[in-house]
Amino acid sequence: MESYYLAGMNEASLPNVIIGGAPKCGTSSLYFWLAAHPEVYGSPKKETFFFADKVNRFNASANVHEHDLDHYEAFFKGGQEATVRFEATAHYLYEKVAREHFSNWPHKPKMIFLFREPSKQMYSHYKMERYRTKRIDMTLSEYIQRPQIMDHVDYAKHLKAWMDAMPEGHVR
């Protein structure tokens, strides 16, 4: 991983906590509860997707593949005085690029991952994709047979990758 931008990093303009986890596991609720605290600053955009493995529809305008860290720092420019600065991109649980970047920061952020009983997570995610976003048109049985769906609930595998990448005590 290239760390050309690390030298000029200002710790107070970057998050010291990152919330991730499987989709539909409570990251939005935790984001809003924490952001309401007067000593905590949540990025104005809950999920920045800045360190996603590839450019996708959620981070097309601001991502590590096309921009330097200044674009990421902009999410936290109002929170320099906050004790805790954070964002909550659930998908970072699965993202190799995020692991590589956060583990190479001089000041490693604390990582908090949220999980849910796998069958309930899969069902909730299915309902969202089928009925709310209308991204899929298949039965629940067909949906859960997709390899990526089963991989997304292999929480131990993804959590271990983060625990191997970050210092002890930084992953919860």
Where do the protein language model's features map onto the residues?
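Structural motif corresponding to alpha-helix initiation and N-cap regions
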Residues: 66-69, 95-96, 156
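Phosphate-binding beta-loop-alpha motif at adenosine-nucleotide cofactor sites
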Residues: 85-91, 148-153, 158-172
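Generic structural signal for well-ordered alpha-helices
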Residues: 69-73, 99, 159-160
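PAPS-dependent sulfotransferase catalytic core
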Residues: 1-89, 104-109, 119-125, 129-143, ...
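Nucleotide-sugar-dependent glycosyltransferase donor-binding/catalytic pocket residues
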Residues: 23, 94, 151
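Canonical radical SAM enzyme core domain
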Residues: 94, 118-119
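ATP-dependent NMP and nucleoside kinases share a basic, alpha-helical "lid"
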Residues: 95-113
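Generic recognition of short, well-ordered alpha-helical segments
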Residues: 29, 97-100, 157
